[in-house]
Amino acid sequence: MNDSITVRGKDRYKSGVMEYKKMGYWEPDYVPKDTDVIALFRVTPQDGVDPIEASAAVAGESSTATWTVVWTDRLTAAEKYRAKCYRVDPVPNSPGQYFAYIAYDLDLFENGSIANLSASIIGNVFGFKPLKALRLEDMRLPIAYVKTFQGPATGIVVERERMDKFGRPLLGATVKPKLGLSGRNYGRVVYEALKGGLDFTKDDENINSQPFMHWRERFLYCMEAVNKAQAASGEIKGTYLNVTAGTMEEMYERAEFAKQLGSVIIMIDLVIGYTAIQSMAKWARRNDMILHLHRAGHSTYTRQRNHGVSFRVIAKWMRLAGVDHIHAGTVVGKLEGDPSTTKGYYDICREDYNPANLEHGLFFDQPWASLNKLMPVASGGIHAGQMHQLLDLLGEDVVLQFGGGTIGHPMGIAAGATANRVALEAMILARNEGRDYVHEGPEILAKAAQTCTPLKAALDTWKNVSFNYESTDTPDYAPTPSVSM
């Protein structure tokens, strides 16, 4: 089945229906060029459908093919523009599923456009009837394509310089409850959290401009809180002002107002769409603003293993698009996140070059062509008692956001912030002293709590609470590569 079965010559363009694998979309001898975009799909064919034909159909329908032969193919450089499925492997331990490797000529894509890239790669093909399910698992983006994108507007290094925070993770909290607070009370939460020791607070994904608190009111009270907290602490502080709105004009207006008020950071939601994200990233670059992206909505298509788009692909696209922060999982929190898979997401965000690593779900080497690094954000169900685990699993270049773990503190918001800051500082000190902070973590925290009542209260309240559920999206790691079909 490794032989090419492409029909050549005039028979290739006879009117009628022809199998995709015979039209040139299956080329097992093809060697991808350095400039090719490569997509790895998990293909689940309908019963009785040949996996080679199903994979060739994915290549065809995501590039130049339609359901029947069209003579106008002869007016194009058809051999060049056809996507080529060159390898199909059975997925380890998943009967009926196949990994299809498909190469696309770079000329098929518009420079610097995630919208155009996604329109081809995840366009109509996901509704193709011969497939039970289809998932985009990973992509190899060539340097020639990567360099057409801006990349993160600010980047990790410059963000740390602006915030004057070095040698430790940044600390944040999402204001809770996310909906219903007045502007004045919202600002009080921001002030207490920042005064207590956090670096950032943030709006949640669905706080925009509602009857109980219009956006301008929120921005004014939040920035008043930031300025007061900076004066009280002597540290640079920030709050993610969510500028997500119904139109680009409204988002630009909100972003400009945030800038006028002196904010160092604004926020957008993934649901605004790829073009809007890139537009806001370009605005942030021009205006020296950090851009935080909340991945609201991603689990509708990233969570299931057999259908949709892997978050590792979304992370790659967002690094290209130009955001500075992205929620990337916590492992130990309340949201989906297999440890190995999550490490792969963090590698995509923070490394200059990603070598293939099947254990972390990375199928391809990925160069980043000096694009700025993207700061991953960990949030959702984390608390001070997990600090040693978070530092070990996620490293130093990360924002740890304790929403409930700050605002739910029994002694109040400022005490919750202090508990998190003291826990982090104690763990960083232990790490820098060469201690085995992972195994000694509970002991280190208990000792720090002896001189910090807020930390003791946090540890007594949440103890070792964790959300230990089996992940639905785990790497299909095989010790040896499967044999090409």
From Swiss-Prot:
Mg(2+) binds at K202, D204, E205. The record marks K334 as: Transition state stabilizer. Binds 1 Mg(2+) ion per subunit. Its EC number is 4.1.1.39. The keyword Magnesium applies. PROSITE patterns: RUBISCO_LARGE (PS00157). Pfam families: RuBisCO_large, RuBisCO_large_N. The keyword Ion transport does not apply. Its cofactor is Mg(2+). Belongs to the RuBisCO large chain family. Type I subfamily. This is Ribulose bisphosphate carboxylase large chain 2. The gene is cbbL2.
